[in-house]
């Protein structure tokens, strides 16, 4: 029987923190982020940009940047809003969320900018 490995992420070590599903993979390139946003658009989900302080990243509440972009289908517009949010809140984590109207829940979300860890 093999031994169970310890989970290496610790709250006391901010560099080890993981966020969202894709955080266990290598960092996404700009093109890969673009593909993820294109997927959100292709599913008909409503994109939104959210941000929070690194110390609150594990909480359920992230601040919404403006309103959700209802019906937005231009990937560049969505990415520019995420960039504007990051420039306005440079120390915060910024994520893009795809809201699924049919299931009335988040279809997906991914952190596109990581803030400065404490």
From Swiss-Prot:
Give me the disulphide-bonded residues. none
Q: CDD domains in the record, alphabetically?
A: RuBisCO_small (cd03527)
Keywords on record: Calvin cycle, Carbon dioxide fixation
Q: Which GO terms describe its molecular function?
A: ribulose-bisphosphate carboxylase activity
Q: Which residues form the signal peptide?
A: none
Superkingdom, taxonomy of origin: Bacteria
Q: Name one GO biological process term.
A: reductive pentose-phosphate cycle
Q: Which family does it belong to?
A: Belongs to the RuBisCO small chain family.
Assembly and interaction partners? Heterohexadecamer of 8 large and 8 small subunits.
Summarizing the function annotation, the protein's role is: RuBisCO catalyzes two reactions: the carboxylation of D-ribulose 1,5-bisphosphate, the primary event in carbon dioxide fixation, as well as the oxidative fragmentation of the pentose substrate. Both reactions occur simultaneously and in competition at the same active site. Although the small subunit is not catalytic it is essential for maximal activity.
Misc. comment: The basic functional RuBisCO is composed of a large chain homodimer in a 'head-to-tail' conformation. In form I RuBisCO this homodimer is arranged in a barrel-like tetramer with the small subunits forming a tetrameric 'cap' on each end of the 'barrel'.
Q: What is this protein called?
A: Ribulose bisphosphate carboxylase small subunit 2
Q: Which organism is it from?
A: Acidithiobacillus ferrooxidans
């Amino acid at each position: 029987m093999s031994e169970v490995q310890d989970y290496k992420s610790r709250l006391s070590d901010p560099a080890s923190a993981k966020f969202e599903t894709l955080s266990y993979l290598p960092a996404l390139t700009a093109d890969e982020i673009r593909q993820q946003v294109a997927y959100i658009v292709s599913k008909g989900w409503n994109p939104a940009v959210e941000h929070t302080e690194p110390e609150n990243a594990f909480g359920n509440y992230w601040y919404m940047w403006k309103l959700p972009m209802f019906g937005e289908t231009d990937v560049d517009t969505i990415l520019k809003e995420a960039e504007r949010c990051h420039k306005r809140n440079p120390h915060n984590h910024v994520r893009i969320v795809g809201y699924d109207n049919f299931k009335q829940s988040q279809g997906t979300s991914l952190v596109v900018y990581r803030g400065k860890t404490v």
